[in-house]
Amino acid sequence: MTKEFHHVTVLLHETIDMLDVKPDGIYVDATLGGAGHSEYLLSKLSEKGHLYAFDQDQNAIDNAQKRLAPYIEKGMVTFIKDNFRHLQARLREAGVQEIDGICYDLGVSSPQLDQRERGFSYKKDAPLDMRMNQDASLTAYEVVNHYDYHDLVRIFFKYGEDKFSKQIARKIEQAREVKPIETTTELAEIIKLVKPAKELKKKGHPAKQIFQAIRIEVNDELGAADESIQQAMDMLALDGRISVITFHSLEDRLTKQLFKEASTVEVPKGLPFIPDDLKPKMELVSRKPILPSAEELEANNRSHSAKLRVARKIHK
């Protein structure tokens, strides 16, 4: 049975308005989710325009088919159930060579967080899962119970940036020798045992960074985003734009670096002009990330860490 998606879209107007939508253009929503960005983008297209919407979660696609029904009836939407790391291949299969714009809303969606059985949340007791694609084989249970100490430390440091990574990895090792760690609550309690009292008093849940690290590992989120954003920039038509919303420093750092590499060039000294093959292919639309307004921050708590970066294709 399809579960309802209740998702408040973050930076809705900013993300789509910054794409400078062409009514007859071809656009991509790389992270369909609750379909908020897709719906607003479609409202700016003529019936000659088209949207390709990616999601690896069938539940998201099922719900979007209801929300976007008026546009589907006009033949303006194509859903692609796949990881966005396969963006270029899947669009080529659909006969698309160039796109006029693309948006990303990275990370886990509100409905995935809110569905207890998906195992994303440290606030709700559930089996350790955390798969965005429920057909995938690697789960949080596998990571927590079968990764060795060194691999746990690696992902906790790299993806969670938690200064207690070694102690938490050791405590997990000790706990699973007694019995497997099966639920989100069990894992959260183990993490709490390691954190000193002053850490537990800080704002935010003590397990947040470790849960983030495991989720990124299970879904290879940063690897997928890296590949996909580079493919997207390659596929953009001249003057096409890319909008990327991030929710934590690792995603934002990655996006900032990819945009920087595509929008700058190191020219050898002595060259009288820049050869075409050395010219940067992108330019930043906004030097600094765009942040949610005060009104949005008040209305949607999950928007607090959101940042939007936008770039434009200036050279093929």
From Swiss-Prot:
It is found in: Cytoplasm. Its EC number is 2.1.1.199. Keywords: Cytoplasm, Methyltransferase, rRNA processing, S-adenosyl-L-methionine, Transferase. S-adenosyl-L-methionine binds at A35, G36, H37, D55, F84, D105, Q112. One of its GO terms (molecular function) is rRNA (cytosine-N4-)-methyltransferase activity. One of its GO terms (biological process) is rRNA base methylation. It catalyses: cytidine(1402) in 16S rRNA + S-adenosyl-L-methionine = N(4)-methylcytidine(1402) in 16S rRNA + S-adenosyl-L-homocysteine + H(+). Its main location: cytoplasm. GO terms for cellular component: cytoplasm. Belongs to the methyltransferase superfamily. RsmH family. Specifically methylates the N4 position of cytidine in position 1402 (C1402) of 16S rRNA. This is Ribosomal RNA small subunit methyltransferase H.
